[in-house]
Amino acid sequence: MAGQNTSNITNESISEFVYQLDSQPYNMTYADWTAEWWQWAYSVPRDKNPSYDDTGKYCGENQQGPVWFLTLSYEHPVTRICSIPENTSLLATLLNSECSFAEYPNLASLSDLRSCAKEQQDHVVSPMASLNGTEIPNLEDFRIQSGLFNITLPLNNILDLPAQTTQAISDGNWIFIKPLPTGTHKLILKGNVADNINNNINNGSSFEFAGPVGWNYTTTYVLTVKDT
C-alpha cells in the first residue's frame, strides 16, 4: 500500500480504508477499542490533552501500539497537523458520550450507566467524515456502546475531578481507519446534535445532561504518514 495516492478514491473504494463493524482489528472488537480510546483520552492531563489542542502539537501524547486515537475539538473548530507512524490505524470519534460513577455518583448499576450513555448519544444526528475529499458513507451504522471499563483520572484531568479510578460505559459514533499510505492526508470529522436538544434538557432528563463530546464543531486533521 505504500506510496498509493488516495486523493482520487471514490465512494466505491473508500470502504477499503475503513474497518467493518464486525471486524476485530488487532484481535479486539470495535467496542473494546472504543473503551481504549476513552482510557487514553482521560489519561492525559488537560494542559497537554489532544482534545484541547488547536494545532496538533499534542497528537502523540500517550499514543502507543498499532492504533492511534483522534479526538474532536471540545471548544471550537480546529485544524490539527499531525505526524503519524507508518502502519498505524486511526480510531476517531464522530461524537461520543460516556457516563461514569465518578461523574454521576447517583448512578448505582451497570444498567444505569448504559441508559445514561445512550440517552446522551441519542441526541447525535448525521455524523460526517471525509478522507482526502471523499465522504465516508453509512456512518450512522457505526454507533457502538462499550462494555464496562475502568478509567483512571490523573491530576488536572479534563473532567476537573479528583484523581481516581472509576468505571464507565460509553456510547458513540466512530470511524476506524486502516493504515494509510505514506504521504499527506486530510481527514475531516464532524458530529451534529439534534435541534431539539435544548427542549430535551429543559423538560428534564433522567440524568444531568453534559452533551456528547465534541458537539457541533468540525475538526480537520492534516496527517503526514512517514516512513519508519
Label for each model-derived stretch:
Residues 5-64, 215-217, 223-228:
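N-terminal segment immediately downstream of the Sec signal-peptide cleavage site
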